[in-house]
């Protein structure tokens, strides 16, 4: 076998007959498989041991030679080579076909490659191949046309007319083979190039397509006649096995049936030819052979598929590759692995952030080899076999050994569906009793796990390297930030939030108010003994608290609560004391009003202070983000554990529960509803009198009920008691929101019908009062729609993620700096008055392209090519700068990836991105993972305002990434200038917009009902929208440059996600959009050897032009092409990646004709062939490092180098560091 890690590339071509013979170990002549009595393979049959190798290791068929010592000997009795039985997976056979047969991929595919090569229509080809017509091979001196088609009857007439032997015409694949042999590629290509200079319309399109195919044959060295098969390869028997079932029956792969059919028909044809049978019988047999081979290669592609028992279509070779169950997606891209298990998860509140609980019986099975090795090493038993017995018996001694083996050995936990990389994280196992895996409560958010019966899978990394990677890169304590937006993903939730909320509440007049304590311990003791309440405001000496006080704050009394003292206890030392839940307190420290000189009047000071709100979920998130910024991961994960324990402890002490008495009653609910009823009656009256349309009536009624519900909601909020448990749960962000609250205490309101339309009759009751039967029915109506939507959305979102991953999987950080001279000018994204994404958010974590100066003073804020930190971004915005030119993925020059400077920081770590990071996959996951949170609906703008629906949510994201024509498309102008007039034409129900500019005038027809974005006298830029709606990106590309289109798409995606409250970093969308626009269509080849109309990678296009320009020739011109992600995935340079994505047969057909080479640059193609992926530690620059032991003393104090040997490169691999440093002395 070839060593996969030694491959540079992989090529696919058409197989020539001689190639097929060179693969084969013998001809399969009989259709038999195995003998039903002996169960041994038949000679010369489909499972023959002589051809394919022995069925038992190191043993020939007759049993003369047994054991490994005879390896390589071919038995003189039975002819079987003594070798491993594994060769039955790799040795091929062949069938010599007695008549040539066409390959269905090349004849039937779209476009038909055979048809284009011969310039014949697919229908004519079909008639010839399946013996329904003759084709003229050589007209000789007759007036017949070369390649003309004639029926049996016409053929006989022509023979009578011109005499026998006066011309040559044949039928079947043999005729096509003769024609293909006659094709002179060079001559045809030259003629087509000439024709292209003058041709137009349909003729030109056809010529371009033919030229493409002929050029592919010419350049790849494939011969066109190889599309016709004279010899058929037989795949190894272990890839089409026969298994004995209990009961003596056999289960066999469908391929065996299909091969049997071919062999039977081939043998029958041979016999008929020997007997010199009548032509019509031979023809019929040849046609049947052709159909049998078609079925073997792609059953069902032409005519009715061949079926097996129960009229099930048989799975042919093509079906073995296609689809989710095919070879690519089922066995090559994802495999089942050993050393894995799965179980239900339960909560493990006592675990540390980096730990998970593994049941003992699971652990002993997973770590069995490690335990056995240790048993032998300790001389408890002598050999592995005995050790295995010991483990299986459950000997007492194994448990201590297991404890030691799992120490420092991380395991991976995964929860399906794995929507982003946080769906697999590493933990240190802790042995527990029971059968459920224990999971830390804080990692639930990343996994989207809960404990209502979810299951998780566990995997054991085996090699030293795998363990090191799991420990350093994948440990759960390291994953504090979410890769999609750089915000903490591990924030306390539910009980933890509630506990900390309760702990930090302030109340006036509770016991112990105004007491002063000398230190923390005294305050806590007073609280424990019941002298002071947790929420009472008290004083404490600042000197006793280990916090960064200023000089004025020292030797003072701080006014706070016992709860806040406990809350601040868990915070790291360098962090200010947290008294108010806001960012100012977090970054700048406690405001002066909370300090009192020693001996001051504390009661008076307290009475002058307002009560502070407690710390909510959002505040806790901000605290965690700030701590991460200052102290990085280790300290943050320790703090999170302390915050979790504190939260659980105090939510238990508080004992907050929900009872029916906690749901308040709104006194004037009846009046509000009465008023609305009256208004609805008035509206109905107006409609009956014909004053308003039905649509207007419907909108007014629904708006009225919405207003009633909002009124009730406002009353509830105004009258809520901050100590009400439901209000506390809601306000803290632990569970529930105002909508839930108003359904419990106000009214349920309007419901959606299954068709998405809102029903006019509202549900007036709330859950406290209870619903009537009719109301209950209405609410199930709406609820059912919610459930179906969710189910459909999940599938849609998953498929979107798959397409995104596919298009971007080869985008990897390849170098430090690409040295580009272009940048992207960015400003905040806004829609009307609404801010979508601020400039500060867009700048954070990016590199500048140009110097940024203060607009007033001219002082330099930040130089070129510098990283913009959070503080710098704030400084830039505060200075009043509105637009900044930054390094962007759009303008990066790196081939097959991005450079570090154009990408900026890795949002998951907050540091500059490392070379080797697979940013394409991260981007795809970041956009796909929140997909399920987006709505499905097409948004109705109230039925009146516009004539089209605006697509939103998930369908809009798909529309953008697939570059489809949007629903409700906006009309755009191609002229830059002034809108001179807008005329309405009542007869055609349209408006005309006139734009006058320096370069010319434009006249645009827009629908009568369209909402205008411009008015007379307004200035418009090129490509600006004249009406409301979405711009079609392909049209925008025709009038503007590539960067404008990329910027537009980026803004549109952000609008959809931000409107749903989902934050995604710009860079992820940039990576995706760049992948959609990396191809060029050649308009004029100039002096290059490119073909007109070819779609090619922009880098290859530039290279071809470079070579021509150096030689002094005319460069080619091309036009950038915007492709949807599905099309872009299929057009990628890697045929392995494209074939494993969609349309497998089409991709492979095309690749084979072109003789495509896959340079294995992406992740998918390397996974498929089993090579380590070229990202992360798999990159060549990291693979070539040899680790060696380092003397610690020398490492810390390196010896002084002598002069003269500066060239040596010393590489130090330090296991505690993620990156590998190359230090050149």
From Swiss-Prot:
Pfam families: RNA_pol_Rpb1_1, RNA_pol_Rpb1_2, RNA_pol_Rpb1_3, RNA_pol_Rpb1_4, RNA_pol_Rpb1_5
Reaction(s) catalysed by this chain's protein: RNA(n) + a ribonucleoside 5'-triphosphate = RNA(n+1) + diphosphate
Binding site for Zn(2+) 2: 818, 892, 899, 902
Domain of life: Bacteria
Gene3D superfamilies, per the entry: 1.10.132.30, 1.10.150.390, 1.10.1790.20, 1.10.40.90, 2.40.40.20, 2.40.50.100, RNA polymerase II, clamp domain, RNA polymerase Rpb1, domain 3
Keywords: DNA-directed RNA polymerase, Magnesium, Metal-binding, Nucleotidyltransferase, Transcription, Transferase, Zinc
GO BP term (any one): DNA-templated transcription
Any one GO CC term of the record: DNA-directed RNA polymerase complex
Signal peptide feature range: none
Single GO term (MF): magnesium ion binding
InterPro entries: DNA-dir_RpoC_beta_prime (IPR045867), DNA-dir_RpoC_beta_prime_bact (IPR012754), RNA_pol_asu (IPR000722), RNA_pol_N (IPR006592), RNA_pol_Rpb1_1 (IPR007080), RNA_pol_Rpb1_3 (IPR007066), RNA_pol_Rpb1_3_sf (IPR042102), RNA_pol_Rpb1_4 (IPR007083)
Stated role: DNA-dependent RNA polymerase catalyzes the transcription of DNA into RNA using the four ribonucleoside triphosphates as substrates.
Family designation: Belongs to the RNA polymerase beta' chain family.
Record protein name field: DNA-directed RNA polymerase subunit beta'
Organism: Streptococcus pneumoniae (strain P1031)
